[in-house]
Amino acid sequence: MIQVLLVTICLAVFPYQGSSIILESGNVNDYEIVYPKKVTVLPTGAMNSGNPCCDPVTCKPRRGEHCVSGPCCRNCKFLNAGTICNRARGDDMNDYCTGISSDCPRNPYKD
């Protein structure tokens, strides 16, 4: 028996943001996106990112997790404020995590 799942994939996992697709159960790497009069094969691993932080249906952090990826995200949690996320090069200064985002904001000051 073939099971059919309706899944919405976000841009972070597959470049068809907000597209509704129909998937047949079986090998994840063999799923296809079905459009009217058109079938497009998903690239290998499109649905199986292997990221334990990511809800594969919503492409958002799983319940209780802060982030999916980023320079200030480790083990699905934001790194502490003040953690170096980008080491200084040349006359630049280090960039630091804020503790409330997975992004690494640029330090506006120079040495």
UniProtKB/Swiss-Prot annotation:
GO cellular component, one term: extracellular region
Positions of the pro-segment in this chain: 21-47
InterPro entries: Disintegrin_CS, Disintegrin_dom, Disintegrin_dom_sf
Family: Belongs to the disintegrin family. Dimeric disintegrin subfamily.
GO BP annotations, alphabetical order: cell adhesion; negative regulation of blood coagulation
Name this polypeptide is given: Disintegrin lebein-1-alpha
Keyword Signal: yes
Role, per record: Strongly inhibits ADP-induced platelet aggregation on human platelet-rich plasma. Also avidly binds to the laminin-binding beta-1 integrins (alpha-3/beta-1, alpha-6/beta-1, and alpha-7/beta-1) in an RGD-independent manner.
Localisation: Secreted
Keywords from the UniProt entry: Cell adhesion impairing toxin, Disulfide bond, Hemostasis impairing toxin, Platelet aggregation inhibiting toxin, Secreted, Signal, Toxin
UniProt motif Cell attachment site: location: 89-91
Subunit text: Heterodimer with subunit beta; disulfide-linked.
Organism name: Macrovipera lebetinus (Levantine viper)
Annotated SMART domains: DISIN (SM00050)
Expressing tissues: Expressed by the venom gland.
